[in-house]
Amino acid sequence: MKFAKKYEKYMKGMDEELPGVGLKRLKKLLKKCRSDLQSHENDGSSAGRCPGHCSVCDGSFFPSLLNEMSAVIGCFNEKAKKLLELHLASGFKKYTMWFTSKGHKSHGALIQQGKDLVTYAIINAVAMRKILKKYDKIHYSKQGQEFKAQAQSLHIEILQSPWLCELMAFYMNLRRSKKNNGAMELFGDCSLVFDDDKPTISCNLFDSMRVDISLTCSICLDTVFDPVALSCGHIYCYLCSCSAASVTIVDGLKSAERKSKCPLCRQAGVFPNAVHLDELNMLLSYSCPEYWEKRIQMERVERVRLAKEHWESQCRAFLGM
């Protein structure tokens, strides 16, 4: 079965109607564009390869795809955030959320909903990449690749969403629970892999569809500890990200200046809306307990030192010293 038919069948089979990529409509646009290009080439006109003379290029294709992917990422982030808040809540708040939540009364139901969300994210990401690849093939251009890069800077690339990584960790955390052993088969293709002590979360869906998320901090070059994901999608240790943003652990990442850039992609303004990856933090603490205990001791000493330096500098500033 071709991907377009598989995608259409998947979207129609969902329990509720969610935003998606209009593959059929976009492919019709490209088919019309291909016909126009071929007619220009048959006439011997060089305009056949000129994006400026293509009705698809100058307003129909990319704006439509941009709106659709914005709707998809917005829907995914909102639903993933609500699901994870329900799982991480404690005490009276958790009781209230479970009582008011409809249809999510069991851990098995939580796992299934999370599985559906991950599948939804990955299949829409693949749909976007395939239609952009088709666009470039028809137009002999790299505009599709340029759009994909633009999507990353606009934070509508769904594979860069921090909630995708959190959902994968969420599965493995629930799967670890003894009382949820019956639900382990629901998502057997998601795993935490260590290659030369370098951890990676891997996920396989739809045969050839695979997502790998590195869990090595590119600043300290160690396994991420107390991980946070910046708006650009890159994951760092909390202390490392504070250092990169030139803020103290007391003030936190929300106080970072908008001009502060991600150490990897150099995108500015990605620190204030960073997301703490609590599910991932739990997963790593269970998976490598000895390493985690050592990091806890080291981090505790470092955080006390940094907090002390911060308050001492505040006192000196207050006293005019």
UniProtKB/Swiss-Prot annotation:
TM regions (residue ranges): none
Per the record, the domain comment is: The RING-type zinc finger domain mediates binding to an E2 ubiquitin-conjugating enzyme.
MF GO annotations = transferase activity; zinc ion binding
Which of UniProt's keywords are assigned here?
Answer: Metal-binding, Transferase, Ubl conjugation pathway, Zinc, Zinc-finger
Give the GO terms filed under biological process for this record: protein ubiquitination
Where do the SPX domain residues begin and end? 1-149
Its EC top class is transferase
Q: What is the lineage of its organism?
A: Eukaryota, Viridiplantae, Streptophyta, Embryophyta, Tracheophyta
> Part of which pathway?
Protein modification; protein ubiquitination
UniProt EC number:
2.3.2.27
UniProt catalytic activity? S-ubiquitinyl-[E2 ubiquitin-conjugating enzyme]-L-cysteine + [acceptor protein]-L-lysine = [E2 ubiquitin-conjugating enzyme]-L-cysteine + N(6)-ubiquitinyl-[acceptor protein]-L-lysine
**Name of the protein this chain belongs to:** Probable E3 ubiquitin-protein ligase BAH1-like 2
Positions in coiled-coil regions = none
What are the residue ranges of zinc fingers typed RING-type?
217-266
Similarity-based family: Belongs to the RING-type zinc finger family.
